[in-house]
From Swiss-Prot:
Source species of the chain: Albidiferax ferrireducens (strain ATCC BAA-621 / DSM 15236 / T118)
GO molecular function, one term: structural constituent of ribosome
Disulphide bridges: none
One GO term describing the cellular component: large ribosomal subunit
Domain of life according to the entry: Bacteria
Official protein name in the record: Large ribosomal subunit protein bL32
Start-end of Basic residues biased regions: 9-19
InterPro entries named among the record's database cross-references: Ribosomal_bL32, Ribosomal_bL32_bact, Ribosomal_zn-bd
Length: 60
């Protein structure tokens, strides 16, 4: 079983955990339709940055 050789100081412990923070996902609002979607992703109705890039099933 692995056992530490020396005690890790509170400073080193904090530096070790520096990248463990939870991050809230970036939510964007589509300017044309007002729908919310993840940043850099297409909105559910096929719009990206104000332009329609995919046709939905109802439009096809």
């Amino acid at each position: 079983m692995a056992v530490q050789q020396n005690k890790k100081s509170p400073s080193k412990r904090g530096m070790h955990r520096a990248h463990n923070a939870l991050v809230v996902p970036g939510i964007a609002v589509e300017s044309t339709t007002g729908e919310t979607h993840l940043r850099h992703h297409i909105s559910p109705n096929g719009f990206y940055r104000g332009r329609q890039v995919l046709k939905t099933k109802s439009e096809a």
